Swiss-Prot record:
Species of provenance: Escherichia coli
Function of the protein: May have a possible regulatory function on the expression of the other AFA-III genes.
InterPro entries from the UniProt entry: FaeA (IPR006793), WH-like_DNA-bd_sf (IPR036388), WH_DNA-bd_sf (IPR036390)
One matching Pfam family: FaeA
Any GO BP annotation: regulation of DNA-templated transcription
This protein's name: Dr hemagglutinin AFA-III operon regulatory protein AfaF
UniProt gene name: afaF
Alphabetically ordered keywords of this record: Plasmid, Transcription, Transcription regulation
Transcription regulation in keyword set: yes
Family, as annotated: To E.coli PapI and DaaF.
Amino acid sequence: MKINKLTLNERKNDILSYFSEINTPFRTSEVAEHLGVSAYQARHYLQCLEKEGKIKRSPVRRGASTLWEISAVTEPSVKTDRIAD
């Protein structure tokens, strides 16, 4: 029996590519099911991505499911210098 061991970066990339395709908020349990891992492991991957700023978590509310979503890519703002006359 071959055990499929992926690195942390491979797991995170898999999460990002899968959920950028469906483009809707997702639950930890959905990530766990997609990756074939426990909810605890999925939460670990999601928290790593959150720390990197690649995804964001819904505000924590008592009794509500945590939803995750891909962070919007923000472009750096362009500064223009004013030239004095």
